Amino acid sequence: MSRISSLQDPFLNALRKEKVNVSVYLVNGIKLQGQVEAFDQFCIVLRNTVNQMVYKHAISTIVPAKSVRMVYSSFNPYHQNSNDEQDENVDDIHSDDLEIQENEGNIHE
């Protein structure tokens, strides 16, 4: 698993499971809104009145409408664990802008 997917996949999965409304900003400035229906290493399916498949390379930012509770592995190099535990960590992700980068992973439905 790559470093990026150790943060990206749990974030998208939490949005999907909790059916959180999100605003997705594309690199060309267009704003899409909906819920994350599914995702894989290359795209995200957004559900609103219709389903839209959006390629991740076109996404600049994903902003959740509410805080999201996220679970991820502790080997994440971007997370500092004060206890240096090798178990799962839980963080709250707030509606702050989060940049999405390409990753490797399987489809999540």
From Swiss-Prot:
- Keywords assigned: RNA-binding, Stress response
Record's keyword annotation contains RNA-binding:
yes
Name the GO cellular-component terms: cytosol
Region (Disordered) residue spans: 77-109
| Positions of transmembrane segments | none
Cross-referenced Pfam families, in alphabetical order? Hfq
Q: What are its GO biological-process terms?
A: regulation of DNA-templated transcription; regulation of RNA stability; regulation of translation, ncRNA-mediated
State whether it acts alone or in a complex, and with which partners, per the record: Homohexamer.
Q: What does this protein do?
A: RNA chaperone that binds small regulatory RNA (sRNAs) and mRNAs to facilitate mRNA translational regulation in response to envelope stress, environmental stress and changes in metabolite concentrations. Also binds with high specificity to tRNAs.
- Cross-referenced PANTHER family, in alphabetical order? RNA-BINDING PROTEIN HFQ
Family listed: Belongs to the Hfq family.
Q: Which protein are we looking at?
A: RNA-binding protein Hfq
